[in-house]
Amino acid sequence: MDQKTKEIVNNIMNYVIGKGASDEIKKNQHSVTKTLSLSADNLCLESIENDLWQHILDRIKCFNRDELLFLAEFMRESFSARLYPVALLYQFATINDIGIYISKIVLGNELLFNNRSCMDLPKLKYLIDCIIFYDNVKTKIEYTKRNTLSVTIDDIFEPVKNEVVDNFFQGYALYLNSIKVEDMEISNPKLRQYLTDIHLTPDEIYKQANPVIEDIVGFNYDDVDYLLYKVPYMMLNTTYSSDRENRFHIKIMRNDFIGYFKDYISEEHLINVLKYLSINHCLNDGKHNNREVELRCITENDGVLSFAVRTIVECLGIFKRITITGHYMDEVTYSYQKSKLELHSTDLIKQQQSMSTYFSYVVAELFESYGYLIAKDANGYPDVDIKDIIVNGSRLVFNDIDVLAFDRNTNTIINCELKYYKVKMDYAGMTKDALNKEKYESLFKRETTLKNNKSAIVKVVFGLTIPDSSIEVKSIVVTSRQNYNTKNITEYNFEEFKRKLLNNETL
């Protein structure tokens, strides 16, 4: 990449995150208004969306195809490296979203590009503002009822006015930075060995899942682990780096990429990895959703692969996290893999259940570490996923208490429900009200049974003799990840839960 292109890319990055760009944004908004012949009022959002998309396609043809793809990679790479983690100051899109849009438009449409053109900063800024505007209009149509109403020129460029949107990125940062179940550790050596013996640690669960995921996508988690370790070394050793100073972006012949790893991963598996990561392959298979494209990061042209090192590492890491629980398998798999996906549907459910059970052991150990009594099995290990308890010769059916604990300071039985949420990949997933009242019916039934048998349960499970009148029952939900669901019960994400225990706060 020459010096002029570098300067333009840096200028674009600063522009995207809002540094001194307000006047130019207003100028470009005025140009869009004029080009699309938008009147002062009675504007239809869906009509604007269609017209603007066509306008973007017309504008993007004026650029050099490879330079656009490089810019898209650079944006996504910078977001992966958290060099530019900031959302646009006045918009909903991020540099990651803009990079995905550009890749999708360039590779997913039969366009005749002006490949002899040079990067033009004002034209690029205008194109990006059009993409931002398009994303904003789509957001309004999808997440508000405004698409059934007319809007004015002054209003059309404003982002969605919603408290959830205002707080989205602050909460999303907490979500991204929170520890994942796959990374949670058991500190008790005896319990850790027990879980290893029964194949219930994340490492063991991944080992068991290897043949399942390999049969579905054609490569396995061992391959992913090796690539996660080895790919960063490519920017130090390959002679195909597109920019020796930057070292983040690599152009390499497809056969050379395969040759770089084939001593450790079979050629067949490597070919399938490249198919999975290829944006071209994704679009050709009919996957055009931004979130589906986001899972991929390699662009192909005449046998040459182009990608950003940090982004390929992030995409592989995301693949490993979301597939172990069977989440987003429709987005991960291609059309020709659907039969294998259906064949292994039960296996994927078992993997999720195993990871959820491991989560129960982690939470139970935390309770005990901070002075709570916990239900234990005959061998002295935490008794999780409790189905029933025998009290005075009678069997009390609970079906599934994830963790049962007792606070000796307040004489409170803690009925703990765990939610192992799938990774949320977009705004809709983060804000969807998935936890309706019915989701808690079983939890409330268990709570009622506990309240009706308080002293007997405390005696049988925790070995304490305390009268009913002195015992309270509290139900809480601990989620593996941050979420924005409407709550009708006390709920903590895992980080909040740990902090509560650490500070000896009442749950």
Task: Please place each PLM-identified region on the residue numbering.
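Composition-driven low-complexity segments enriched in polar/acidic and proline residues
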Residues: 1-350, 479-507
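Short helix/loop segment immediately N-terminal to the Walker
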Residues: 183-184, 191, 382-387, 456-467
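Accessory recognition modules or surfaces
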Residues: 332-346, 353, 359, 385-396
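Extended, amphipathic alpha-helical scaffolds
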Residues: 335, 362-363, 376-377
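A short, highly charged nucleic-acid-interacting micro-segment common to nuclease
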Residues: 341-363, 367-368, 433-438
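Active-site metal-binding core of divalent-cation-utilizing nuclease and nuclease-like domains
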Residues: 376-411
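Active-site beta-strand-loop-beta-strand hairpin of nuclease catalytic cores
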Residues: 405-425
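Catalytic cores of nucleic-acid endonucleases
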Residues: 420-479
